A protein has these predicted regions:
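Helix-loop junctions and terminal segments of transmembrane helices
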Residues: 1-7, 182, 186-225, 229
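Interhelical loop/hinge segments that connect adjacent transmembrane helices in multipass membrane
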Residues: 47, 101, 117-161, 199, ...
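Interfacial/gating helices of multi-pass transporter permease domains
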Residues: 101-104, 141-145, 149, 167-187, ...
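Hydrophobic alpha-helical transmembrane segments
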Residues: 47, 78-126, 186
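Membrane-interface helix-capping segments at transmembrane helix termini in multi-pass transporters
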Residues: 5-17, 28-54, 97-105
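Alpha-helical transmembrane segments of multi-pass membrane proteins
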Residues: 24, 36, 40-66, 80, ...
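C-terminal transmembrane helix end/exit motif
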Residues: 35, 63-68, 72, 94, ...
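Alpha-helical transmembrane segments of multi-pass membrane transporters/permeases
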Residues: 10, 51, 56, 66-91
Length: 230
């Protein structure tokens, strides 16, 4: 949506304000549900889970904001900051301070906080956000686009969470080890495709209304199939 208004500052502000306001609303609703349901959750580190979900909501929104306004450098640097701070904090909390499992969760949360702060400062999000610019029609358009993607994301989450458990139970732990190693190779392939897909989707959005868009799309799709099926 931001790609369509890349040259329209007011349009960008309206979209960013609407999305971030919706993130606040979603986070409040989620935390209210968590407060009600927390007595039924026996996990020792359930509060870290609640915080992590809220941080993920805002981090995802800010990452897409960076891509939408063409700040690919900030997008890349934020990923580096997230990974680096996570590793350093894990070493500090687990190896040095001996916090154990709690240190791992704390490191994850703090690394996301650091990344979010970097994104807010480097992208100057404050200049794009204003409560009065919240637009229900923008949210409806985004929801209309997003809802069909939910089953797909849930399916991938179920597969990712259950495949190793099923392999271990049905075939055995040794087979699960082989399966995990094999997944590393496919994971590398998927990572390569994801890098290509980031630039590809942006190019499609930017050139969709041009006269030679059909030729551009056809050639790119053909080349993509040749590359990833060879």
């Amino acid at each position: 949506f931001l790609l369509d208004v890349r040259d329209n500052k007011e349009g960008q502000k309206k979209i960013v304000s609407s999305v971030l306001s919706m993130c606040f609303i979603q986070s409040i609703i989620y935390l209210l549900f968590f407060i009600v349901a927390q007595n039924f959750i026996t996990a020792e580190y359930k509060y870290y889970l609640a915080i992590d979900v809220v941080l993920n909501v805002f981090l995802s929104a800010l990452l897409q904001f960076a891509r939408g306004i063409g700040k690919t450098t900030n997008y890349t640097v934020s990923s580096f900051i997230s990974a680096t701070s996570n590793i350093c904090l894990n070493v500090l909390f687990i190896a040095v301070l001996r916090f154990g499992a709690e240190g791992m969760f704390l490191a994850t949360v703090l690394s996301k906080v650091v990344t979010i702060l970097y994104m807010i400062i480097s992208l100057k999000v404050v200049r794009y956000y204003a409560v009065h610019l919240f637009d229900k029609s923008v949210i409806k358009q985004i929801a209309k686009y997003s809802f069909p993607l939910i089953p797909n994301q849930l399916s991938w989450w179920v597969v990712g969470a259950s495949d190793r458990v099923i392999v271990s139970k049905v075939i055995g732990v040794a087979a699960n080890g082989v399966y995990s190693i094999a997944n590393k190779f496919s994971g590398l392939f998927v990572s390569f495709y994801n890098i290509f897909n980031l630039s590809w989707t942006e190019s499609v959005s930017l050139h969709l209304d041009e006269e030679d868009s059909e030729k551009f799309l056809t050639e790119t799709i053909n080349d993509m199939f040749k590359l990833f099926t060879c």
